[in-house]
C-alpha cells in the first residue's frame, strides 16, 4: 500500500521508454537496453518506501492503537493528520492521546509515549471502524500536501529522501 502509488506513477512515466520487471520482494526494475551490446551497463538504485504506521488494535471505543514503521519521534506525532488505508478506501484521522485537562501535573511535564497514543478516525466504536474497512494490520501514512515555501524555491513534502532517487532515475530513462 505504501509504495503502490509511486510504482504506478513511475510505470506511467516510463511506459514505452523502459522494460519493466519485478522481483519476489516487490522491487521494480526498469531496463533500458542499448542497441550497442558493448555499451557499458550502469545501475541506478533507489528506494521508494516511506515511514508510516500499522493498526495494531481497534479499541471498543473505535480508537486505533498502532505501531510505528520507521523512525518517529514522539515529540512530533500528536496532532499529526494521517490517512488510514482501509479495505473500503482511505480515511482521514489524527493522532491523539489523553487530553491535557485530565493529565496529572507530573504527566504534563513529560512527552507522551507512543504506546499512549491512538488514531482517532471519528467513529463511535470498534464495530463502526470495521464497517469503514479498518482492520488489524491496516496501513497508515502521514498526510502531507506538497507546498512551495516562502523563498519560492524550497519545497515541503514527505518521503523526499526516498523518492528523489526515483525522480532522478525517471529523468535519466527519459520519463
Regions found by a protein language model. Name each.
Residues 1-175:
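N-terminal hydrophobic/helix-forming segments and targeting peptides
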Amino acid at each position: 500500500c505504501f509504495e503502490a502509488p509511486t510504482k504506478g506513477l513511475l510505470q506511467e512515466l516510463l511506459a514505452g521508454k523502459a522494460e519493466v520487471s519485478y522481483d519476489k520482494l516487490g522491487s521494480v526494475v526498469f531496463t533500458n537496453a542499448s542497441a550497442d551490446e558493448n555499451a557499458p551497463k550502469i545501475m541506478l538504485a533507489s528506494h521508494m518506501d516511506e515511514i508510516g504506521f500499522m493498526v495494531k488494535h481497534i479499541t471498543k471505543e473505535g480508537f486505533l492503537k498502532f505501531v510505528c514503521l520507521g523512525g518517529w519521534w514522539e515529540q512530533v506525532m500528536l496532532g499529526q493528520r494521517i490517512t488510514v488505508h482501509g479495505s473500503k478506501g482511505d480515511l482521514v484521522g489524527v493522532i491523539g492521546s489523553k487530553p491535557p485537562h485530565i493529565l496529572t501535573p507530573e504527566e504534563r511535564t513529560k512527552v507522551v509515549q507512543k504506546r499512549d497514543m491512538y488514531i482517532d478516525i471519528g467513529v463511535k466504536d470498534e464495530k463502526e471502524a470495521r464497517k469503514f474497512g479498518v482492520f488489524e494490520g491496516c496501513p497508515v501514512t502521514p498526510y502531507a500536501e506538497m507546498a512551495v515555501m516562502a523563498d519560492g524555491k524550497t519545497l515541503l513534502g514527505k518521503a523526499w529522501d526516498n523518492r528523489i532517487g526515483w525522480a532522478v532515475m525517471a529523468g535519466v530513462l527519459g520519463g
